């Protein structure tokens, strides 16, 4: 009898969601098995959350050949990990290697996807998925365009981040970890994912100028690099703090005056805490979940470049309280993705 639920995490966001799913199902006495890729803070978040995992594979890099090699290598390693286990379903956020292995072994894949702009990842996962779970903000036609079967799509009125943000309580210890004083103004920053398949050109070369501008206003910057070369450049700027280890980033956002990120997750998390959050995304493509949160009243903003965002950044630095929002009521109105995940597991016979 297949009775184990397999979770696979590729990114820090996915580690957060996997942690929420793991805790939910383990509390009900279910068997849960977690695999995770070595990338950014993915493994460290699982460790901070107390989630046992098997590290499998690494990030592929910038070139198509490197990505393909990493995909194939990780698929083989995942096969070795799961082939002898009694797995009833895979849950992932569009993990190409994991979904391919699950499909080959006849394991139903339940795939979450809120990034239809990530074309390659979507095409590699959605056609092979038994269930596709997505926020209602993402048009069904976008998922179908990527190969999802219409009857497989299950949408919910919320965003993925609700799973771990709704009950989150900030811990001021994170300030001590970075030698920041209570009430000391700082901005949290993270650069874009320059090596992502959906970004064909380098983006965000003026990030150093922006950090220098912020610290010139006597506001510190806590910078989370994606790659080693970004770390070394940021550490040369006085007033910029580059964490040396994984920490409670969500608590950190709670005490910041603003978040500036080249990704979507950090901006959504920050805005759900009521902190003004700027997402920088260079493509002419809608960010459906960000737009959804903005329409709901969360303080999330989107620009194509740092220079385009500079006027708003300057205004927020002048008066951060003016842009902060009490979001507790707004957050409680959003649906938790754990609900459609549970119903999907029941549908594939995993919770019967």
Positions of the model-derived regions?
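Donor nucleotide-activated moiety binding/catalytic core segment of transferases
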Residues: 74-81, 228-266
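Catalytic binding pocket for nucleotide-activated donors in carbohydrate/polymer assembly enzymes
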Residues: 272-317
């Amino acid at each position: 009898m297949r009775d184990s639920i397999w979770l696979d995490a590729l990114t820090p966001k996915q580690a957060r969601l996997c942690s929420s799913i793991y805790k939910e199902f383990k509390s009900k006495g279910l068997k849960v098995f977690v695999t995770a890729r070595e990338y950014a803070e993915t493994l460290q978040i699982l460790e901070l959350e107390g989630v046992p995992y098997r590290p499998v594979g690494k990030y592929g890099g910038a070139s198509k050949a490197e990505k393909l090699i990493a995909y194939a290598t990780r698929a083989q390693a995942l096969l070795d990990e799961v082939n002898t286990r009694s797995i009833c379903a895979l849950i992932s956020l569009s993990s190409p290697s994991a979904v391919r292995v699950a499909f080959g072994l006849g394991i139903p894949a339940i795939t979450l996807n809120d990034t239809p702009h990530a074309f390659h990842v979507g095409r590699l996962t959605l056609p092979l998925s038994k269930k596709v779970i997505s926020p209602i903000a993402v048009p069904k036609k976008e998922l179908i365009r990527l190969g999802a079967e219409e009857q497989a799509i299950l949408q919910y009125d919320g965003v993925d981040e609700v799973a771990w943000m709704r009950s989150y309580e900030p811990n001021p210890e994170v300030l001590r970890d970075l030698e920041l004083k209570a009430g000391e103004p700082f901005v949290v920053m993270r650069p874009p994912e320059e090596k992502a398949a959906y970004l064909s050109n380098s983006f965000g070369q003026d990030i150093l100028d922006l950090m220098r501008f912020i610290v010139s206003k006597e506001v510190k910057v806590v910078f989370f690099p994606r790659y080693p070369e970004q770390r070394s450049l940021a550490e040369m700027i006085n007033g910029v703090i580059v964490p040396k280890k994984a920490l409670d980033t969500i608590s950190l956002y709670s005490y910041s005056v603003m978040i500036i990120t080249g990704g979507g997750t950090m901006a959504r998390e920050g805005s759900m805490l009521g902190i003004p959050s700027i997402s920088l995304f260079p493509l002419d493509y809608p960010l459906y979940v960000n737009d959804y949160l903005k329409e709901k009243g969360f303080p999330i903003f989107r620009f194509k470049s740092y220079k385009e965002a500079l006027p708003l950044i300057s205004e927020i630095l002048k008066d951060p309280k003016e842009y902060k929002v009490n979001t507790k009521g707004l957050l409680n109105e959003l649906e938790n993705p754990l609900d459609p995940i549970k119903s999907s597991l029941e549908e594939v016979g995993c919770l019967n």
